[in-house]
Amino acid sequence: MPSGRGDDADSTGNALRRLPHVRKRIGKRKHLDIYRRLLRVFPSFVALNRLLGGLFPPELQKYRRRLFIEVRLSRRIPDCVLVFLPPDSGSRGIVYCYVIEFKTTYSDADDQSVRWHATHSLQYAEGLRQLKGALVDFDFLRLPRGGGQVWSVVPSLVFFQQKADRPSFYRAFRSGRFDLCTDSVLDYLGRRQDESVAHLLAATRRRLLRTARGKRAALPRARASAVAGGRGGDNARRGLARGRAHGPGAQTVSASGAQGSGSQGADLLRGSRRARVRGGGAVEPAVRARRRTVAADAATTTVSSAFFVPRDRRGRSFCRPTRSL
């Protein structure tokens, strides 16, 4: 015949599983929101303790901290494991480890509701069972012959209302003391974190780091524009100085335009000289004829732009333009 304690545990689990799926989804989202906020405030002991309702004593403010989320132990998966290491790395002082279970509720929980409220009391009983299993898992990590560091494992329950930023109720239970190898246990907790949650939290951590770096490296727009304007003015002044260096009548042109025109003129001069030397003067009439053609075209353009000459459909002019005296 099964024991009454096992029947109570089964009935508690069945009752919580019968909750509406909407409430379960909201509870999962609230858990992820709590994890993100834990990462956000983790560097500050005051903000971290405020988020959890003052769960930690002030003496732990000087301790070094390690945070683990949803660690898969042999029996249970606690929502959060917070480890407080002694301030000195070589110290053999006590390590305080808080194993925390988060419970999300539709209404605020308190000391009375966890006893008499139907859902709150079931969540409270389930949390106690989960924390007890976590203590058994830490007992399996105990060194058989001692010689390790003393760990004080504190099981804790924290109730959050689903729309609240701070817990409505928390309770820390009697701690258990274990002789553990600190480095091995920390490595074990880090490797046993849930992978999907670890990736999500890693992305959140990278985003927080980028935001912090962006705030430090940001330059005001007014200052940036002033710097850019100063650089542009310097470049313009340098260009004017270069133009003045070539002479009083020099004009400011772009470097590419000056280089292109200079190279074209040099090529034309070289070509005409080479043709004149190689041809022995035979090309001179052709060069003169080309110059006359260019001059005639220029004169025609000047006359046509100065006078309006009416023409018929075939392009023949009705009258000839008179020459100016």
Curated annotation (Swiss-Prot):
May participate in nuclear egress of viral particles. Plays a role in the dispersal of several host nucleolar proteins including NCL/nucleolin and NPM1. Since deletion of host NCL/nucleolin negatively impact on nuclear egress, UL76 supposedly acts on this process through its effect on host nucleoli. Induces cell cycle arrest in host cells at the G2/M phase following by apoptosis. The mechanism involves the inhibition of host mitotic complex cyclinB/CDK1. This is Protein UL76. Induction: Expressed late in the infection cycle. Keywords: Host G2/M cell cycle arrest by virus, Host nucleus, Host-virus interaction, Late protein, Modulation of host cell cycle by virus, Virion. It is found in: Virion; Host nucleus; Host nucleus, Host nucleolus. GO terms for biological process: symbiont-mediated arrest of host cell cycle during G2/M transition. Residues 247-258 have a biased composition (Low complexity). Residues 222-284 are annotated as: Disordered. One of its GO terms (cellular component) is host cell nucleolus. Its main location: virion. InterPro entries: Herpes_UL24. Belongs to the herpesviridae UL24 family. The keyword Aminoacyl-tRNA synthetase does not apply.
